[in-house]
């Protein structure tokens, strides 16, 4: 959430930078609500100061009739204050609800653009494999090996659900454990295993609510949501807390299943594992000081990249333009993995800095020093990685002409020493 004072003092800048997102923001409504709030606040404070002053005068009056008259006047003032404060609460709630719908201001270094066509390729890693045969997409590989069962997945739950079988289920589990071990043992993240359902406050804190409720799975009869990403519960671990500056940066990693309606994806990626209602993901989350956040973003991005480097799978890093970054993000880098069966790069991770946008919504602060005034932390997160899409990348990049799939060396200890799925 943006700070009302920041918007007020930087109206033209905020409006101009939000326009680069391709979203119009009702600045006139903000000015009206903010102006009314400040006016009512001033009226309330003026009358309260008057009441306090007269109360002190009454205590000094010797004339009881005069004191009674002044008390009557103050009862009227108190009624005025009550009415003004009720109006103030109403306006503050309206202003708060408005601010919750305003996206984050893109960082000034974020490339300006309208869509993914304007994103900037930062670097590529690895060579695209030159296969001596026509590569298959992962759904054909998985069905051919009997390790992915899309038909029975649909029978169990409908479209965009998959049943993993045998070596497919074990490969998914191997990827999860490999990613967790790498991030915990070498990158020094603290592992978390959060609830897979959260309350409305959590979803509001990270920015999914109120704007994107239709994309979420809501539990009927109770106000819980299935998590769309571990970002939601893990970021909210410190909701409403004041952290020690000496403890920053704090780095958490969490494996969770994720649940998404994919409401705007009708007709897209209808085959395979790319776009599912339920999928597994390993998430990286950081809490940092404002001064350190962009350095930590590069570290987080590097940690996510390392997963693919050790798997020896080609990828590229893309910086998202202002028209393509998410609602809460100030800057985002995507990692896109090469998929020979589809002859293209596909997103496998988004790594973002939200600056204080989420922290302000969730009330996450820190003290730079022991007795210093609390400040909002900066939050960061990124996939490290999306597990199903990593499995897709393994199947397509390690496929062999005979239909089998070689197992990357780093995964073999997690696969009982097996070298091939056939």
Curated annotation (Swiss-Prot):
It is an enzyme of class 6 (ligase). Keywords: Aminoacyl-tRNA synthetase, ATP-binding, Cytoplasm, Ligase, Nucleotide-binding, Protein biosynthesis. L-serine binds at residues 229-231, 283, 383. It comes from the Bacteria. It holds the Pfam family Seryl_tRNA_N. It is found in: Cytoplasm. The keyword Ligase applies. SUPFAM superfamilies: Class II aaRS and biotin synthetases, tRNA-binding arm. Pathway: Aminoacyl-tRNA biosynthesis; selenocysteinyl-tRNA(Sec) biosynthesis; L-seryl-tRNA(Sec) from L-serine and tRNA(Sec): step 1/1. ATP binds at residues 260-262, 347-350. InterPro entries: aa-tRNA-synt_IIb (IPR002314), aa-tRNA-synth_II (IPR006195), aa-tRNA-synth_II/BPL/LPL (IPR045864), Ser-tRNA-ligase_type_1 (IPR002317), Ser-tRNA-synth_1_N (IPR015866), SerRS_1_N_sf (IPR042103), SerRS_core (IPR033729), tRNA-bd_arm (IPR010978). One of its GO terms (biological process) is selenocysteine biosynthetic process. GO terms for cellular component: cytoplasm. Homodimer. The tRNA molecule binds across the dimer. Belongs to the class-II aminoacyl-tRNA synthetase family. Type-1 seryl-tRNA synthetase subfamily. Consists of two distinct domains, a catalytic core and a N-terminal extension that is involved in tRNA binding. This is Serine--tRNA ligase. It comes from Geobacter sp. (strain M21). The gene is serS.
């Amino acid at each position: 959430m943006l700070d009302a004072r920041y918007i007020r003092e930087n109206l033209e800048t905020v409006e101009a930078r939000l326009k680069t997102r391709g979203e119009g923001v009702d600045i006139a409504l903000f000015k009206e609500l903010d102006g009314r709030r400040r006016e009512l606040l001033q009226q309330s404070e003026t009358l309260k100061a008057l009441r306090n002053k007269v109360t002190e005068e009454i205590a000094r009056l010797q004339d009881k009739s005069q004191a009674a008259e002044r008390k009557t006047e103050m009862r009227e003032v108190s009624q005025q204050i009550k009415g003004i404060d009720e109006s103030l609460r109403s306006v503050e709630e309206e202003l708060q609800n408005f601010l919750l719908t305003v996206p984050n201001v893109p960082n000034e270094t974020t490339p300006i653009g309208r869509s993914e066509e304007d994103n900037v390729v930062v670097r590529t890693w690895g060579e695209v494999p030159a296969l001596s045969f026509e590569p298959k997409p992962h759904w054909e590989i998985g069905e051919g090996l009997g390790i992915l069962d899309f038909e029975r997945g649909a029978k169990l739950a409908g479209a965009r659900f998959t049943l993993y079988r045998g070596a497919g289920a074990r490969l998914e589990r191997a990827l999860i454990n490999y990613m967790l071990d790498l991030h915990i043992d070498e990158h020094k993240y603290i592992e978390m295993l959060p609830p897979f359902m959260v309350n409305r406050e959590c979803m509001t804190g990270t920015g999914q609510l109120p704007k994107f409720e239709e994309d979420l799975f809501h539990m009927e009869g109770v106000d819980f949501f299935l998590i769309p990403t571990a970002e939601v519960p893990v970021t909210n671990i410190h909701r409403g807390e004041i952290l020690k500056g000496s403890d920053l940066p704090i780095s958490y990693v969490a494996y969770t299943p994720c649940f998404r309606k994919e409401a705007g994806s009708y007709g897209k990626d209808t085959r395979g594992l790319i776009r599912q209602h339920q999928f597994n993901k390993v998430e990286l989350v950081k809490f940092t000081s404002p001064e350190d956040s962009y350095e930590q973003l590069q570290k987080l991005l590097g940690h996510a990249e390392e997963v693919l480097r050790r798997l020896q799978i080609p990828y590229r890093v893309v910086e998202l333009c202002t028209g393509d970054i998410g609602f809460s993000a100030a800057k985002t880098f995507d990692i896109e993995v090469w998929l020979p069966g589809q002859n293209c790069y596909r997103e496998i991770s988004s790594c973002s800095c939200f600056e204080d946008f989420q922290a302000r919504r969730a009330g996450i602060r820190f003290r730079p020093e022991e007795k210093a005034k609390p400040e909002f932390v900066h939050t960061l997160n990124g996939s490290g990685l999306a597990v199903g899409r990593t499995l897709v990348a393994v199947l397509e990049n390690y496929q062999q002409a005979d239909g089998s799939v070689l197992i990357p060396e780093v995964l073999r200890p997690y696969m009982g020493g097996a070298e091939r799925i056939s």
